[in-house]
């Protein structure tokens, strides 16, 4: 992939052992430029060191742009707030995968294809029965998504012509598997997709309907979940997306790649953070105890951490959190809980106190996307163990867009990070009786 804005006349100079190396500066269309260090190891006989890849761009991408200092998030140039307020999830999915918003005909064809592929193979049901009833839905989902490789053996050696259909299949089947994971975890029968419903309605139907009870979708709840899905659809090169790209760089089949993304997302520092926020609010218990927990958060010797605040990229208010705060109020108002929901009351007071505290201001710790999403889920009747599962439904769109872009990029190679070795130089082996 080449960037038309790159100016080969600009270089950075790196001096190593008295020798100067000229490194090209690659120009971004917006945001920070990048120093190309790809030739350093070959020419200077050394590597760069960047724990956590905080200063490393692993790829060029046209999908998502983030300005953490200004609190900006854009997909293909469109502001996230505009997409959340004016679009729907499958339209955003189309945008991320194809690069442009669809026409009416393109949108209709795309949604029909997603609906057509929402069923999963009946034999997958037997896989669910191998799990104990107490299994976490993320564990079940992780195994089920990886097992799709067995049902689509033709994609073990996929071709460029398979990219789009693969993305559609993945977007369609992940919600079905997610709902099945939930149903199995609570001992209820699986509910089949209903193609007369839209994407978000269908997921709620599979989650909450039973063979003897029809679930009527509340439009406020549906719209809120639609926004949540949009806000979680992609977020540049985060841990799970980078994991998908790294797995994909080896040529692994797309189902295996997405399962690695799900595994990475499950971590409490990534997709599991919204569940941690709910647990934190439960621990705080009442607004009167907020000052106590603020003090605990400031104490470096105290293991307590204020969940839902701060972000590796954002040093301003997360634009997704701003949308979710208002969405949370809309949902609770619809459900008659706006004035008496203890989770919202604690969250709002906690945010207000933290945003006025110099400790948090100096460290630029603002509410992130996880701070309010869990409260919305809980109000909807979605249990906390399903929070990260819903995150995975939304992020599958971003993972597939990034996976597709990676395979279309001629510059991409199999990922192979290097290390700074600090272990023993050499040791002689001794038999066990001599040690």
Swiss-Prot record:
SUPFAM superfamilies: Citrate synthase
Pathway it works in: Carbohydrate metabolism; tricarboxylic acid cycle; isocitrate from oxaloacetate: step 1/2
Active site (record annotation): 311, 370
Family named by the database record: Belongs to the citrate synthase family.
Subunit structure: Homohexamer.
CDD domains found in the cross-reference section: EcCS_like
Enzyme Commission number: 2.3.3.16
Regulation: Allosterically inhibited by NADH.
Keywords: Allosteric enzyme, Transferase, Tricarboxylic acid cycle
GO CC annotations, alphabetized: cytoplasm
Domain of life: Bacteria
Pfam families the UniProt entry points to: Citrate_synt
Reactions catalysed according to its record: oxaloacetate + acetyl-CoA + H2O = citrate + CoA + H(+)
Leftover remarks: Citrate synthase is found in nearly all cells capable of oxidative metabolism.
GO biological process: tricarboxylic acid cycle
Protein name per UniProt: Citrate synthase
Gene giving rise to this polypeptide: gltA
MF term (GO), any: citrate (Si)-synthase activity
């Amino acid at each position: 992939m080449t960037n038309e804005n790159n100016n080969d006349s600009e270089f950075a100079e790196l001096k190593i052992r008295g020798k100067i190396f000229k490194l090209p500066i690659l120009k971004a269309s917006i945001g920070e430029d990048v120093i190309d260090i790809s030739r350093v190891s070959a020419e200077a006989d050394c590597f760069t060191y960047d724990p956590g890849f905080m200063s490393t761009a692993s790829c060029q991408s046209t999908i998502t742009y983030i300005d953490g200092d200004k609190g900006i998030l854009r997909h293909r140039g469109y502001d996230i707030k505009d997409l959340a307020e004016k679009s729907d999830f499958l339209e955003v999915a189309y945008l991320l995968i194809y690069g442009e918003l669809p026409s009416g005909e393109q949108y209709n064809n795309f949604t029909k294809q997603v609906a057509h592929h929402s069923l999963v193979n009946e034999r997958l049901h037997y896989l669910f029965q191998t799990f104990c009833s107490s299994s976490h839905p993320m564990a079940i989902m992780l195994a089920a998504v990886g097992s799709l490789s067995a049902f689509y053996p033709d994609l073990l050696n996929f071709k460029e012509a398979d990219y789009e259909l693969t993305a559609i299949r993945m977007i369609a089947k992940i919600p079905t598997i997610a709902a099945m994971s939930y149903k199995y975890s609570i001992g209820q029968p699986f509910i089949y997709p209903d193609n007369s419903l839209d994407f978000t309605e269908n997921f709620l139907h599979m989650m909450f309907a039973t063979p003897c009870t029809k679930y009527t979708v509340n439009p406020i709840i549906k719209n809120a979940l639609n926004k949540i899905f949009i806000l979680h659809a992609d977020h540049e090169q985060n841990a799970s997306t980078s994991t998908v790209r790294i797995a994909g760089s080896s040529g692994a089949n797309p189902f295996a790649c997405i399962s690695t993304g799900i595994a990475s997302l499950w971590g409490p520092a990534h997709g599991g953070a919204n569940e941690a926020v709910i647990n934190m609010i439960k621990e705080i218990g009442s607004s009167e105890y907020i000052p106590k927990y603020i003090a605990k958060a400031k104490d470096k010797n105290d293991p307590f951490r204020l969940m839902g605040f701060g972000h590796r990229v954002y040093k301003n208010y997360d634009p997704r959190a701003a949308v979710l705060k208002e969405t949370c109020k809309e949902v609770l108002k619809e459900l008659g809980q706006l004035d008496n929901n203890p989770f919202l009351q604690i969250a709002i007071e906690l945010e207000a106190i933290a945003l006025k505290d110099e400790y948090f201001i100096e460290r630029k710790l603002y509410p992130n996307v996880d701070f309010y999403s869990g409260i919305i889920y809980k109000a909807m009747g979605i249990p906390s163990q399903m929070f990260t599962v819903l995150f995975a439904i939304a992020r599958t769109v971003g993972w597939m867009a990034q996976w597709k872009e990676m395979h279309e990029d001629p510059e991409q190679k199999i990922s192979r990070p290097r290390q700074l070795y600090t272990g023993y130089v050499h040791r002689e082996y001794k038999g066990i009786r001599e040690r």
